[in-house]
From Swiss-Prot:
It comes from Oryza sativa subsp. japonica (Rice). Keywords: Apoplast, Disulfide bond, Glycoprotein, Manganese, Metal-binding, Secreted, Signal. This is Germin-like protein 8-10. GO terms for molecular function: manganese ion binding. Residues 62-212 form the Cupin type-1 domain. Residues 1-22 form the signal peptide. InterPro entries: Cupin_1 (IPR006045), Germin (IPR001929), Germin_Mn-BS (IPR019780), RmlC-like_jellyroll (IPR014710), RmlC_Cupin_sf (IPR011051). Mn(2+) binds at H109, H111, E116, H157.
């Protein structure tokens, strides 16, 4: 039988290995600017030859302070990830500006590859996230200018501007160069091809006609 010290060492190695594969890979050099034209397929992007790298690979022009045009649900997400700044490749971070119209929201969604930390720049936001099964506990808070809130990786979360007269603005930092986003309503009712209405009617315990109506709607897909 293995000694307790060997079992402990094996457990620690398993924990370290799990942490290593649960986030973006760490850089092994000063930088690895994404080569968007490389034919090499890797998890992320191949590195551009350093002799072709310049400051513009780490730069994005200012996100203007003027309010952005919002979509049907009253929000506009401006994401800066590795696709906009190639120098973010292997660095495990991205950022987004989110503009909210009065009574606008960033609808329930999840980031499959990132934790998010949100800071309110202007206005007020009601925010929250829901834990996984079986409890599905809602953690929510009303945030004002300067307040910060964290959304754990992979959990469904949302932001809503409760003010009917004033817009709101927030900045979100995400722990991945490419966090991904799954907008829940869009994924369930707007998938291509659509999920069977029989499946959804049973899942939501409603009539098929209700599902057909929901699938016929246009569902916003906030990209970040």
């Amino acid at each position: 039988m293995a000694s307790p010290s060997i079992c402990l060492l094996a457990a620690l190695l398993a924990l370290v290995s799990w942490q290593a594969i649960a986030s973006d890979p760490s850089p092994l050099q000063d930088f690895c600017v994404a080569d968007m034209h490389s034919p090499v397929l890797v998890n992320g992007f191949a590195c551009l030859d350093p002799k072709y790298v310049n400051a513009d690979h780490f730069f994005k022009a200012a996100m203007l302070d003027t309010p952005r045009k919002t979509n049907k649900v009253g929000s506009n997400v401006t994401l800066i990830n590795v696709m906009q700044i190639p120098g973010l490749n292997t660095l495990g971070i991205s950022i987004a500006r989110i503009d909210y119209a009065p009574l606008g929201e960033n609808p329930p969604h999840t980031h499959p590859r990132a934790t998010e930390i949100l800071t309110v720049l202007e206005g007020t936001l009601y925010v929250g996230f829901v834990t996984s099964n079986p409890n599905n506990t809602l953690f929510s808070k009303v945030l004002n200018k300067g307040d910060v809130f964290v959304f754990p990786e992979g959990l469904i979360h949302f932001q809503f501007n409760p003010n009917p007269h004033q817009p709101a603005v927030a900045i979100a930092a995400l722990s991945s160069q490419n966090p991904g986003a799954i907008t829940i309503a869009n994924a369930v009712f707007g998938s291509k091809p659509p999920i069977s209405d029989i499946v959804l009617a049973k899942a939501f315990q409603v009539e098929k006609g209700t599902i057909d109506w929901l699938q016929a709607q246009f569902w916003e897909n906030n990209h970040y």
